[in-house]
A protein has these predicted regions:
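Residue-level signal for threonine
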Residues: 23
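A residue-level signal for conserved active-site and pocket-lining positions in enzyme catalytic cores
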Residues: 58
Length: 95
């Protein structure tokens, strides 16, 4: 996984290379989806992430990365690939 522009990484989901972007809008969507307010609350929620939470986070990052089919891509992703992609995006952007 590589960073191609600020906030964006490339990741592989299945046979497809996708762009995930951690933007302010994506963070807002993630906070809303997880019912968390702020990065500290998000970190706490991430420690007990459900499959629905993971899908919501991946969808927000894919949408911010420019994928119009973000919902379908997130739902089709293998759980391990989805988790790795989300982790890589946050690690690349929140150092």
């Amino acid at each position: 996984m590589t960073i191609s522009q600020p906030g964006t990484i490339s990741a592989t989901l299945g046979e497809m290379t996708v762009q995930l972007r951690l933007s302010l809008a994506a963070l807002m969507q993630i906070e809303d989806a997880l019912g968390a307010s702020g990065l500290e609350a998000l970190a706490a929620r991430f420690r007990a992430l459900t499959a629905s939470d993971l899908s919501a986070v991946l969808t927000a990052l894919l949408r911010a990365g420019g994928h119009e089919d973000a919902d379908a891509l997130a739902q089709a992703a293998a759980p391990a690939e989805a988790a790795q992609a989300v982790l890589a995006c946050f690690e690349a952007n929140l150092k």
